[in-house]
Structures are given as structure tokens and as C-alpha cells.
Amino acid sequence: MEVPFKKCDILIPKKGINYNLWSVIACDQYTSQLEYWDKVKELVGDNPSTYNIILPEVYLENEDVEDRIKKINETMNNYLNDDLFETLHDTMIYLERTDSTGKVREGLIGMIDLDSYDYNVGSKSLVRATEKTVIERIPPRKKVRVDAPLELPHIMILIDDEKKEIIESLKNKVTSEDVVYDFDLMMNGGHVKGYKLN
């Protein structure tokens, strides 16, 4: 059986970019709290940030969604043209996320084969949804991606690993030389540390 989770090219901001302002929470969070996103916008200001290249779902009902999508795509192209990114080729990132309570959650960043994914209830596909998909949110998500030169996935995949042999084993395989980022997240989001896997 082919595993639908793979190594890929991962873009990260080059050194000198403020990672705290660059990294924002997923677009499907705080969907009824406009004040959260207003504060993020205020914090980011004119700095490079993923805030400028995602469509927070709190804005989905706004009349200016089409304009926002156009601006997102323009900004993505600007970031690429301005050479903001370093490319980590054919790799995965082992991640340690410390939340605001101090609890550490470990994870792995890579690429998922969307042909193996099915969000329909009762699906037996290799990759399937653990919660109900809000169908109405799919069209604007797809529309953002039509002309987008960058992908900003924000999904979390749960894996069957009863013996804890995958994620847990990685912490013993990385060293301080493998660290590609290590910073506090904005808005009391905790801390994140990423290690490039060789």
C-alpha cells in the first residue's frame, strides 16, 4: 500500500523576516470573532505575513470576497518575486508546538496526496475527515486556489500508530543543527520549533 503522506518542497521565510508576524492561525479559526482578526491585521501592519495570503473564513460573507482573493494572489506573486522564501527541498519537518499551557504537541509537516482524500461521511479512503465538512466553505476555498502560486495547507492529520513509532521516534533523530525555525506565535498562540528531516 502506498502511503499518501510524502516529502515535498517546503517554503519558509528567509532569515530577517519576523516569524512571529509571518505566522498566523488557520483561516478556519475564530470564524465568529472578527475582533481577533482585526487585532491580527493591526499587529501585522505592512510586514510580510501569511495573514495577507489567506482568506480568513470570518470574511466569507463580506461583499469584497472577490477583491480579497485577487489581492491574496497578487500578494503571493509579490512575495515570490521579492524572494522572501528559502526552499527546503524534498523533505519533511518535525514540529514541536508548545501551547499556551506549556503542553508540547509533536507533529510532522509534509505533503498529502489529495487523490487519497474523501470528506464524505462513512468514507473508507486512506485519508478521510474526522469531522463534518462544511460544504458551503468549499467554493471560496477552491476559488482562492485557482490562480494561487502558493499552497498554505492548514490541516492536521491523525494517524494510526498505537506503538508510537513514527512521530515520537523523530525527536531522537534531530539535533540543534536541524532547526529551521524556533519562535513564539502571535496572540498567545504558544511557541513552535521546526527541524528539517534529512
Q: What is each PLM-predicted segment?
A:
Residues 1-191:
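N-terminal extension/subdomain marker
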Residues 195-198:
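Active-site beta-strand/loop microenvironment that shapes enzyme catalytic pockets
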